[in-house]
Swiss-Prot record:
Family matches, as SUPFAM superfamilies: Putative methyltransferase TM0872, insert domain, S-adenosyl-L-methionine-dependent methyltransferases
Protein name according to UniProt: Ribosomal RNA small subunit methyltransferase H
Cited function: Specifically methylates the N4 position of cytidine in position 1402 (C1402) of 16S rRNA.
Single GO term (MF): rRNA (cytosine-N4-)-methyltransferase activity
Top-level taxonomic group: Bacteria
Family in the record: Belongs to the methyltransferase superfamily. RsmH family.
Residues that coordinate or bind S-adenosyl-L-methionine: 47-49, 64, 91, 109, 116
BP terms from Gene Ontology: rRNA base methylation
Organism: Agrobacterium fabrum (strain C58 / ATCC 33970)
Catalyses which reaction(s): cytidine(1402) in 16S rRNA + S-adenosyl-L-methionine = N(4)-methylcytidine(1402) in 16S rRNA + S-adenosyl-L-homocysteine + H(+)
Cellular component GO terms held in the UniProt record: cytoplasm
Amino acid sequence: MAANSGGRSSDADGGPQRHIPVLLREVIAALEPAPGKIILDGTFGAGGYTQAILDQGANVIALDRDPTAIAGGEAMVVANGGRLSLIQSQFSDLAKHAPEDGLDGVVLDIGVSSMQIDEAERGFSFQKNGPLDMRMSASGVSAADVVNRAKVGDLIRIFGFLGEEKQPGRIARAIEKKRAEEPFRTTRDLAGLIEIVTPRKAKDKIHPATRVFQALRVFVNDELGELAQALFAAERSLKPGGRLVVVTFHSLEDRIVKKFFSDRSGKAAGSRHLPMVEDKPAIFENIGKPMIAASDEEAELNPRARSAKLRAGLRTTAPARAADFSIFELPDLASLEKMGG
């Protein structure tokens, strides 16, 4: 899954507002950047969060898997005289780029970037016709590969879980029938079919294709897996007293972050099957409220902020634990490798 001007935006909205990073004030307050500190921005995007961190005197290691974002940030590297390192990398690999003595902070802003949405040739938006691609990097399986090759049952699971689509079976079966005649090549091909199969009703607030496009983007880029790996990598890479700040725009992503901080709080959750579970040392403690949403004022000024949620944790002195992906309760979906051309 990964920007507004700091990182990401929800993909159901319009054009970019790169001068308004979502929850910027709250992110900086949670990170507490200062001279001498090293902060890793795992989702550089257009550099909004990175610039705000640099403005506080901290040094920044910024990552982005998108080569276009890296190229766009080179001027910022030059302008900041060695305090910014900009690296093309998935944020799940952040531990590889952390200094040996650890990081003072990590910020992750999860989702697709405004720049990516704006470029029709990237294929992220049904509002702009282009190749059905959706890859955040330049390699790997595209959305067209998934739509044209995946089994109907796999499409149903992808649309239903990753997109929370209410009629995944109806759409998947229509795709199967249509692709037998000719393959899907463009965003308009897919969006047009979905509009026919599940036409928009007067009460609907979003386009009929919104959830399917979201599901494909999340699947193609393994966004939930990337996020889960990045959280464990941050746990290993932060110094005691280091801060992990994560901004999400969708309930699936927020659920993963919430479960991570809950598991790493050290307070075990018992059940009727296993009522007595031993507490473990806390690896993260909450910073402020467990969850922060955008203010009414920010949501009005920047519609993308309406769905944004911020969660933050303070790294304790407890040693990192083994990465246990079962805590996220993610379903087994189809293999991307089997869908390549």
